[in-house]
């Protein structure tokens, strides 16, 4: 499961001591799951980042270079491989990449 939070400062969660943010669900995920303390993206825009996560490719390979660019025809996402292996997959939220 991936939970993506756009435009989210690295420290804007209560478990990191933010004085105003109240994030009990993220706090629970961090204490019972994984919290990456040193993570980054190669392109700080929504769509290119999503395309990289879902394809495993850098932006110059998948060509989603901004938030208005569609994913090129024939682009394969890793959930498609999971589906071929018999897994049920799902997506909730914004997409921004056409199709």
Task: Locate each region found by the language model.
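Formylglycine-dependent sulfatase
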Residues: 1-99
């Amino acid at each position: 499961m991936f939970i993506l939070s756009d435009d989210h400062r690295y420290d804007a969660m209560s478990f990191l001591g933010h004085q105003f943010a109240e994030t009990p669900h993220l706090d629970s995920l961090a204490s019972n799951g994984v919290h990456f303390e040193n993570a980054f993206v190669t392109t700080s825009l929504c769509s290119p980042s999503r395309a990289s996560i879902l394809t495993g490719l850098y932006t110059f390979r998948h060509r989603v270079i901004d938030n208005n660019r569609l994913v090129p025809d024939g682009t394969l996402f890793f959930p498609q491989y999971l589906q071929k292996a018999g897994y049920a997959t799902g997506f909730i939220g914004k997409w921004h990449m056409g199709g």
